[in-house]
Amino acid sequence: MIQGIIGKKIGMTQIFQEDGKAQPVTLVEAGPCVVVQVKTEKQDGYEAVQLGYGKAKHITSAVKGQCRGFGEFKVLREVDVDDIAAVNVGDQITVSDFKDGEKIDASGVSRGRGFAGVVKRWHFAGGPKTHGQSDRHRAPGSISSTTTPGRIYKGKRMAGHMGNDAVTIRNLVVLKTDAEKNLLMVKGAIPGGKNTIILIKKTGK
């Protein structure tokens, strides 16, 4: 059985539980995906399947050959598989392979925030608002010492580009599936904004 699926983030909403509490949920349009390649231990050194998702506007000859006539896919991703012998090129993967209450890991690209200061990027407290301060309210403070070490240590938290990173959130719960509309309703938040490509894998797979 294939342990993942590719989808697109639709957005967030909320549902009300039996006790009346509101539960934030994320809607993901997952699949249908097509198996475009099966990788085996003998030929590739490991077992996995490559899935294709979405229709591409433009596609190179190399990718077209890789898709093997099953379509011009916008996204290609590899996922694990339990029984490689049961999977064939051309098989379709849909949300019906997931069950309500099942735990998943969701991977995507977080929303880009551009160039951000240390208060927004790293949650620094900033300087005091009074006692003679005029332009130090959101400043980083000291970033290193003097002659020794004479440099800034690697990994020092400073202002810079924020967001647009690959992020994986683990142990999310599938609350509901809709096979007709290819929808997964996932408890909580998933990385990225609307229309972000999301790779969903079953937790621990």
Swiss-Prot record:
Residues 126-150 are annotated as: Disordered. GO terms for cellular component: cytosolic large ribosomal subunit. SUPFAM superfamilies: Translation proteins. The keyword rRNA-binding applies. One of its GO terms (biological process) is translation. GO terms for molecular function: rRNA binding; structural constituent of ribosome. Keywords: Ribonucleoprotein, Ribosomal protein, RNA-binding, rRNA-binding. It comes from the Bacteria. Pfam families: Ribosomal_L3. NCBIfam families: L3_bact (TIGR03625). Part of the 50S ribosomal subunit. Forms a cluster with proteins L14 and L19. Belongs to the universal ribosomal protein uL3 family. One of the primary rRNA binding proteins, it binds directly near the 3'-end of the 23S rRNA, where it nucleates assembly of the 50S subunit. This is Large ribosomal subunit protein uL3. It comes from Dehalococcoides mccartyi (strain ATCC BAA-2266 / KCTC 15142 / 195) (Dehalococcoides ethenogenes (strain 195)). The gene is rplC.
